[in-house]
């Protein structure tokens, strides 16, 4: 028999019907390259987002952290509880329930900052919430996991990658701080950088989703219940975050910001924790869940963006008409109204 008909083209040694095929390291190389490229791009995008953050307003959120406190309740109150309820209600395996809870306990992702710009959110609040949630995750993640995972597993077996959290914090704070400085010193140049960065950020979000699908295409076969949870979880976060912020008396543009910060999780951190905490056998059951959550949090974020753009075009209104002027919240029209003209309806 002709060996060429049975041997793999990648075979390095053939003897009869027996072939030795070297293991492909394409995914490992692609993962390393793309991880490096995406990290650099993300830092550049966060620098551009920082160009829309005003130092005085950012410090104002720190000094009067009512918006941050609402976000904290959503991030480490609503999301872990929602994950727990979904896990119990669906009756999934213990290891799967733990992964769902890990996702619920993660801090907000930087993608929320990019999307907050596109829906005319409060960029100062968005950046401060992401920074604070990442910092507080150092203590809140172990606490939330201890509270909610006791019925399934010893929380001590879950490895919290404090180094990854620290890197995420540095990768967020440094570029944004530089962007804030540029906005303070050269506001006109900052607007140009912001426009370019906002478009690059939108492309980056899509690129991350595509790369994830390519790298882990063989892992998409997973229990249907996890697909259902991965669909419900992000939209529940968006909805509950919005309504809690509204219940707390926050203006509409901040409600949208809190909604995004609540539903959009740091899925990369979740994937890291899962890989560090579970055996290869368990990983086969759960590894895809962070990818599923990533896909649906982006899908629903795109839907929210589309609804917002449609609403503005149909009604011709901006947030200034909806800002409640109270003694506790006498903010002027947000600066993003003057910067982000992309979704302003045409005026005669």
Swiss-Prot record:
One of its GO terms (molecular function) is bile acid:sodium symporter activity. Residues 327-348 are annotated as: Disordered. It is found in: Membrane. GO terms for biological process: bile acid and bile salt transport; bile acid metabolic process; response to bacterium; sodium ion transport. Residues 1-28, 109-126, 179-195, 246-284 are extracellular. The keyword Protease does not apply. Its main location: membrane. It is a multi-pass membrane protein. Residues 50-87, 148-157, 217-224, 306-348 are cytoplasmic. The modification Phosphoserine is found at residue 335. Expressed mainly in ileum and kidney, low levels in cecum and proximal colon. Keywords: Glycoprotein, Ion transport, Lipid transport, Membrane, Phosphoprotein, Sodium, Sodium transport, Symport, Transmembrane, Transmembrane helix, Transport. The chain crosses the membrane at residues 29-49, 88-108, 127-147, 158-178, 196-216, 225-245, 285-305. Pfam families: SBF (PF01758). Glycans are attached at residues 3, 10. It catalyses: taurocholate(out) + 2 Na(+)(out) = taurocholate(in) + 2 Na(+)(in); cholate(out) + 2 Na(+)(out) = cholate(in) + 2 Na(+)(in); taurochenodeoxycholate(out) + 2 Na(+)(out) = taurochenodeoxycholate(in) + 2 Na(+)(in); tauroursodeoxycholate(out) + 2 Na(+)(out) = tauroursodeoxycholate(in) + 2 Na(+)(in). One of its GO terms (cellular component) is proteasome complex. The keyword Cell inner membrane does not apply. Plays a critical role in the sodium-dependent reabsorption of bile acids from the lumen of the small intestine. Transports various bile acids, unconjugated or conjugated, such as cholate and taurocholate. Also responsible for bile acid transport in the renal proximal tubules, a salvage mechanism that helps conserve bile acids. Works collaboratively with the Na(+)-taurocholate cotransporting polypeptide (NTCP), the organic solute transporter (OST), and the bile salt export pump (BSEP), to ensure efficacious biological recycling of bile acids during enterohepatic circulation. Monomer and homodimer. Belongs to the bile acid:sodium symporter (BASS) (TC 2.A.28) family. This is Ileal sodium/bile acid cotransporter. The gene is Slc10a2.
């Amino acid at each position: 028999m002709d060996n060429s008909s049975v041997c793999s083209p990648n075979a390095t040694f053939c003897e009869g019907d027996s072939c030795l095929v070297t293991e492909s390291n394409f995914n490992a190389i692609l993962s390393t390259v793309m991880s490096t490229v995406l990290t650099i791009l993300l830092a550049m995008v966060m620098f551009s987002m920082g160009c829309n953050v005003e130092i005085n307003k950012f410090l104002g959120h720190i000094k009067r952290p009512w918006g941050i406190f609402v976000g904290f309740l959503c991030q480490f109150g609503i999301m872990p509880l929602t994950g727990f309820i979904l896990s119990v209600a669906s009756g999934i395996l213990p290891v799967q329930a733990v992964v769902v809870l890990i996702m619920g306990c993660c801090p907000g992702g930087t993608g929320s900052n990019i999307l907050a710009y596109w829906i005319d959110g409060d960029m100062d609040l968005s950046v401060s919430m992401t920074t604070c949630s990442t910092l507080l995750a150092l203590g809140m993640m172990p606490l939330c996991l201890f509270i909610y995972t006791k019925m399934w597993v010893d929380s001590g077996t879950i490895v919290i990658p404090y180094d990854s959290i620290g890197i995420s914090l540095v990768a967020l704070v440094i570029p944004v701080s530089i962007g804030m400085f540029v906005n303070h010193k050269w506001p006109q140049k900052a607007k140009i950088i912001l426009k370019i960065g906002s478009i690059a950020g939108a492309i980056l979000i899509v690129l991350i989703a595509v790369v994830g699908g390519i790298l882990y295409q063989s892992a998409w076969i997973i229990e249907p219940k996890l697909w259902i949870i991965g669909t419900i979880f992000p939209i529940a976060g968006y909805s509950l975050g919005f309504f809690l912020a509204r219940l707390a008396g926050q203006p509409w543009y901040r409600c949208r910001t809190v909604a995004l910060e609540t539903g959009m999780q740091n899925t990369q951190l979740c994937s890291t924790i899962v890989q560090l905490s579970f055996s290869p056998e368990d990983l086969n059951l759960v590894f895809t869940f962070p990818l599923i959550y990533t896909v649906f949090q982006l899908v629903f974020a795109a839907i929210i963006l589309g609804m917002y753009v449609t609403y503005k075009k149909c009604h011709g209104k901006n947030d200034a008409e909806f800002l409640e002027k109270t003694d506790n919240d006498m903010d002027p029209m947000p600066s993003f109204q003057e910067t982000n003209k992309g979704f302003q309806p045409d005026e005669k």
